[in-house]
Curated annotation (Swiss-Prot):
Belongs to the glycosyl hydrolase 18 family. Chitinase class III subfamily. Glycans are attached at residue 159. Keywords: Carbohydrate metabolism, Chitin degradation, Chitin-binding, Glycoprotein, Glycosidase, Hydrolase, Polysaccharide degradation, Secreted, Signal. It is found in: Secreted. Its EC number is 3.2.1.14. It comes from Candida albicans (strain SC5314 / ATCC MYA-2876). This is Chitinase 3.
Length: 567
């Protein structure tokens, strides 16, 4: 019966995928994570599926090994490569129904990679001969016989990026040999940006589809660190392909990933209109289709639910959302008693971004006068600019200040309407030094995939640069409510050489104004902390925090410039 349907489908004109649409659904097929995987053609009969990604070629460049769990007959070519007659038939069947079929290279478990660009470039010709419209090999020497794929997906997860830009560039050259159809290249980075494995590929090569894994990581869809805006910024500013499409990758069921599963109603809530209506939004991708097919509700299976969500997208009504990164600027001034000269240190930091986030950037400036200083002045200016069509309001945070001979502390707190979990690292300040630290919240997990794997990759995080003292603020994970905690820092008793009246005078002179600005769901929390160092020196620390809903984790602010004037 399937044979007759295949013949009949060849007689019908097929509508090819609209690669520029933002309502496509891409599904991974081949690893049977749902436990009841059907043959490829079964899923292609559904209007909910637009792109099917065969997974995986898990070993390359030599030898080459393919694995499709329960979906291949187990015969081999003369070169020892798995050969699949049923998949070959289904590829052509699906293509004649307007589906795009890609082969994914890599996966969470496998042995693959290149030692240099020359090897990768040569491997592009191997891929073309095996799966493209090439006549260099006999049909019986090709894994899918005479079936011609529509392109390849790079699901590289071993943190080895060498060669992939060269491979993609050479494949583009080979694609031009066949003008009868369109060929595509995809990549499946994990959500931390830039991805350790395909970061260079994404910045150096023309990639059509980016299937971002917003699961198994701290930047999962629905988390306070969901970093769509980081990827949007990549598409707008860094991608060589200005028509690139970003897919929000989700697990198709709770069993399909270690973390990050959201039911259809939650996915619909988290994919806000600014995401759906972005011209760079391509749709939703899923790991994997077998898991999604068995995950049902009253509206159908999970794949059908995802298709219903992306159909709501209207790129012609694209909106702009604004946000800012979490910026921590620390200025420290240390003083010891002596006589008669003064020293002024001034630091200024300005940053501009247009993304929504909850990452942290820290910069620290220290200046010390230990010889002839009777007074010291330090001022810090930090400003963040966002572009938005949303009206703004201003409220003043509540603050409390306490001063004694042993400790001086100031704390401020604000509240807004967003849920954020943020991690902040404050470096220990040492005299006459300039340093900066960046901390990205991490969650490292590893899940292997073998012949019948049930989970797709987990993993990569970005480690923090130097830090000594860490303060972590955790806020409930509800996107509609934010309760910014009050930050208070108390340290050891100041030395006797500095009197309480001196400290009070300097406190009044150096305390910056405290304000809160609400831009959409952005809350700015400015905290002033007085730190007494356990030496004959006193240290003043001022911290500025900006907390937002979506994380732009790549934003890194430059070192603040320091001007020292001696009188």
């Amino acid at each position: 019966m399937l044979y007759l349907l295949t013949i009949f489908s060849l007689l019908l004109p097929a509508l090819a995928i609209n690669a520029r649409s933002n309502s496509n659904v891409a599904v991974y097929w081949g690893q049977n994570s749902g436990g009841s995987q059907q043959r490829l053609s079964y899923y292609c009969d559904s209007d909910a599926v637009d792109i099917v990604i065969l997974s995986f070629m898990h070993q390359f460049p030599s030898p080459i090994q393919l694995n499709f769990a329960n979906a291949c007959e187990g015969t081999y070519t003369a070169n020892g490569i798995l050969q699949c007659q049923t998949i070959a038939e289904d590829i052509k069947y699906c293509q004649n129904k307007g589906k795009t079929i890609l082969l994914s290279l890599g996966g969470a478990a496998g042995s693959y990679g290149f030692s240099d660009d020359a090897t990768a470039k040569q491997f592009a010709h191997t891929l073309w001969d095996l799966f493209g419209n090439s006549k260099n090999l006999a049909t019986n020497d090709r894994p899918f016989y005479d079936a011609v794929l529509d392109g390849f997906d790079f699901d590289i997860e071993n943190n080895w990026s060498t060669g992939y830009p060269a491979l993609a560039t050479e494949l583009r050259t080979l694609f031009q040999k066949d003008t009868s159809k369109n060929y595509y290249l995809g990549a499946a980075p994990q959500c931390p940006y830039p991805d350790a494995s395909v970061g260079p590929l994404l910045k150096q090569s023309e990639i059509d589809f980016v299937f971002i894994q917003f699961y198994n990581n701290y930047c999962n869809l629905g988390s306070s660190s969901f970093n769509w805006d980081t990827w949007l910024n990549y598409a707008e500013t860094d991608s060589p392909n200005k028509n690139i499409k970003l897919f929000v990758g989700v697990p198709a069921s709770s069993r399909a990933a270690g973390s990050g599963y959201n039911d259809p109603s939650a996915v619909s809530q988290y994919l806000t209109s600014d995401i759906l209506n972005s011209k760079y939004f391509g749709g939703i991708s899923m790991w994997d289709v077998s898991a999604g097919w068995s995950n049902t509700n009253s509206n159908g299976n999970f794949v059908e639910n995802m298709k219903a969500i992306v159909k709501k997208a209207s790129p012609g009504e694209e909106t702009t959302s604004s946000s800012t990164t979490t910026t921590t600027t620390t200025t420290s001034t240390t003083i010891s008693s002596s006589s008669s000269s003064s020293k002024t240190s001034k630091t200024s930091t300005t940053s501009t971004t247009s993304s929504s986030i909850s990452s942290t950037t820290s910069s620290t400036t220290s200046s010390t006068s230990s010889s002839s200083t009777s007074s010291s002045t330090s001022s810090t200016t930090s400003s963040s600019t966002t572009s938005s069509q949303i009206s703004t309001t201003s409220t003043a945070p509540t603050s409390s200040t306490s001063l004694s001979s042993s400790t001086i502390s100031t704390s401020a707190s604000t509240s807004d309407t967003t849920s954020v979990t943020s991690s902040e690292t404050t470096p220990v300040v040492t005299p006459s030094s300039l340093s900066s630290a960046i901390t990205i919240p991490g969650d490292s997990t590893t899940t292997g995939i073998s012949k019948s794997s049930s989970t797709k990759p987990a993993t990569s995080t970005t480690s923090a640069l130097s830090s000594s003292t860490t303060t972590v603020a955790t806020i409930p994970d509800d996107k509609e409510i934010i309760n910014t905690p009050t930050d208070t820092e108390t340290t050891s008793k100041p030395p006797a050489i500095i009197t309480e009246s001196d400290a009070t005078t300097i406190t009044q002179n150096l305390t910056p104004s405290t304000t809160t600005k609400n831009v959409k769901t952005t809350s700015t929390n400015i905290v002033t902390e007085w730190v007494w160092a356990p030496t004959t020196l006193r240290t003043l620390t001022t911290t500025y925090q900006i907390l937002t809903t979506r994380t732009h984790i790549e934003t890194v602010f430059a070192e603040p410039s320091t001007v020292v004037i001696y009188n």
